[in-house]
Amino acid sequence: MKRAIVIGATSGIGRALAERLAAEGYRVGVTGRREALLEELAASRPGSFCYAAADIMDPAAACAALERLAGELGGMDLCVGSAGTGDLNPGLDYALEEPAIRTNVVGWTAAVDWAYGRFEERGGGHLVVITSVGGLRGGGAAPAYNASKAYQINYAEGLRQRAAKSGLPLPVTDIRPGFVATEMAKGEGLFWVMPVDRVVEGIVRAIRRRRSVAVVTRRWRLPAWLIRHMPECIYRKMG
């Protein structure tokens, strides 16, 4: 039986992906802030899940929880970093920016480094990170969120390069969703908001194919390309 750990599995993409992996025969370790939701997930398919609650904004506690899960699973073949947060911040209030920085940068880095280290010890595996199309450019509505996702995209590329240089058989898959119908989708008039199940289908496809980068769903590929290559003089007027 294959073993996976999903970081940030209490809701949204992380939870739906954990459920899908369990349905496909994985034994899945899940972690997140809200223990009651993790317990509910574990009870939904007895024997398929183990869980450890931890707040990723406390990197030491989060990594200790991941270590417990890996021990209970007897190792891991796949690790998915899905924890993330972000708020619209029209007033540029630092109190709204700090959770995104502590979650998407500080805690995320600790968790991803932990996973990379375990795969390095094991001699391989598969690391998947959920970034965002939002990380392709800065965003005036939520500056810290966009910046943190750009950080994740570049960090994942760095790990991919590191693995290749050392000869470690470790695909690092960067999943870049557009707008998804989860608690994270904030703001009025968002276009092409995708249902979670379709996003998960795209993620599973990318995992199977061991893709380096996957924009999900496919309809977001052209918008992502346009966002990335749009002249700055045009892009700055869009926020």
Which ranges hold each PLM region?
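Residue(s) in the substrate-gating loop at a strand-loop-helix junction
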Residues: S132
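C-terminal helical subdomain
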Residues: D174, K186-W225
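Conserved glycine-rich cofactor-binding loop
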Residues: T10-S11
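Short alpha-helical oligomerization interface
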Residues: N89-R102
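Conserved NAD(P)H cofactor-binding loop of Rossmann-fold oxidoreductase domains
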Residues: V80-L88
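Rossmann-fold cofactor-recognition segment
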Residues: R45-A60
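Active-site helix of classical SDR
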Residues: V112, S148
